[in-house]
Amino acid sequence: MNHLIISCIGPDKTGLVDTLSKVISKHQGNWQVSSLHHLSGFFAGVIEVAVASEKSESLISELKAINGLSCQIEVAEPDLPDVVSNLVLEITANDRAGIVQEVSSVIHHQNGNLIKLISSNDSAAHSGQDIFKAKAEIAIDDKSV
């Protein structure tokens, strides 16, 4: 069994997820984990698929041939559970360039691994000033805590 990490980007249009899921299903792949987004007119997605080793190459070829979608695919080992503590960090701040770099630098220097980052940009209710919001999931080795 192979685990494929599929990263796709292309102009958003209806039916892209249906197309991806049909191709994966055709090769008896099991869609396991995904994060799919519409960003400024583009579809961007990351999908983990488990598929039989003998079907991997044909699945990869067909995914790369989807019209209007650029897919990069890596074969990965499934995650083995490590002894880690997961922390959740929620950030709300006045928006400015460099916030993500500052946060990721602190996480890195504390031997943390940024597992997931979801961010958005909103307007403050009264002032209309740009507000940066983020929720980060961080894994820290229990030996480092």
Segments predicted by a language model, with ranges:
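A conserved regulatory-domain signal marking ACT and ACT-like small-molecule sensing domains
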Residues: 1-145
